[in-house]
């Protein structure tokens, strides 16, 4: 449905040439939700704006719905863009129009009959859960409701593709979850292909099928969500996954913790599990094999793409040699181990 091939985008500032995207290639299959994640300034927004040629690539090709947009004349490009909806971090609603009026705008620009516009607006408001807000104005809506209006408006022309540019970044967590649930529902109900960009791995975890990691204008890793959470290959992907899980060391442990090992002190370990290591009885195995006792302080587990992953804080009590052997055993079984200190 979407194929970007060797996309490079450069900007000229005076005598300086800035490369925002460098040889980026990706493919999004029809009906898929594809996430691109990266830090601020990585090139995410430039990438998604190249898909509908709001930013024209310096080189490379953009194919959407089997049409090479980069070679279309302007008139045909305008027609092709009707098959590509887009929503943004900021909702860009017209304050002087009601909810229904905002949703109707693209239909009016297409010169549809008023009766057809009214029917379509009613359908879209129902789809977005805004049936009771048709006559409300944007100033009277919450952030989540405004984004729902923007989604309904983006779907007005029955696009085959929806581009989401940091669509939940300005929303609180509960509202973010409701918007993501709406996007997932639309994807499943309409078979809509969705390409979204975000800096939050939690967004990818909740709704995406595939994910790519972008850094300094380059895609450094692409895979299914389940595979990336199971076996992240780059440090940046690993950091994004870690950001979805966080455990604080309890206050009483912090007060007793030392940086250096000494006789009688027990190491506090942070263990990160992905893939098969999550369900394997590895702590029990270390106790049997290496004569160590493990005391779990706290743990958090989650799912992404059908794969379980998690993080755990534990005390590992044993002599230094046995503890070192137990840690090595965990690492051999794809558990990331960090010694946080000693108590």
Swiss-Prot record:
Enzyme Commission number(s): 7.4.2.11
Family matches, as PROSITE patterns: ABC_TRANSPORTER_1, ABC_TRANSPORTER_2, METN
Family matches, as InterPro entries: AAA+_ATPase, ABC_MetN_proteobac, ABC_transporter-like_ATP-bd, ABC_transporter-like_CS, ACT-like_dom_sf, MetN_ABC, MetN_ABC_transporter-like, NIL_domain
ABC transporter domain span: 2-241
Compartments where located: Cell inner membrane
Protein origin, superkingdom: Bacteria
SMART domains, alphabetized: AAA (SM00382), NIL (SM00930)
GO molecular function list: ABC-type D-methionine transporter activity; ATP binding; ATP hydrolysis activity
Keyword Nucleotide-binding recorded: yes
Binding site for ATP: 38-45
Membrane topology of the entry: Peripheral membrane protein
The reaction(s) this protein catalyses: L-methionine(out) + ATP + H2O = L-methionine(in) + ADP + phosphate + H(+); D-methionine(out) + ATP + H2O = D-methionine(in) + ADP + phosphate + H(+)
Gene3D superfamilies: 3.30.70.260, P-loop containing nucleotide triphosphate hydrolases
GO CC annotations on file: Gram-negative-bacterium-type cell wall; plasma membrane
Keywords from the UniProt entry: Amino-acid transport, ATP-binding, Cell inner membrane, Cell membrane, Membrane, Nucleotide-binding, Translocase, Transport
Main subcellular location of this protein, as a coarse class: membrane
Quaternary structure note: The complex is composed of two ATP-binding proteins (MetN), two transmembrane proteins (MetI) and a solute-binding protein (MetQ).
Similarity field: Belongs to the ABC transporter superfamily. Methionine importer (TC 3.A.1.24) family.
Record-linked PANTHER family: AMINO ACID IMPORT ATP-BINDING PROTEIN, METHIONINE IMPORT ATP-BINDING PROTEIN METN
Record function comment: Part of the ABC transporter complex MetNIQ involved in methionine import. Responsible for energy coupling to the transport system.
Protein name: Methionine import ATP-binding protein MetN
Annotated organism of origin: Sodalis glossinidius (strain morsitans)
Phylogenetic placement of the source organism: Bacteria, Pseudomonadati, Pseudomonadota, Gammaproteobacteria, Enterobacterales
Annotated gene: metN
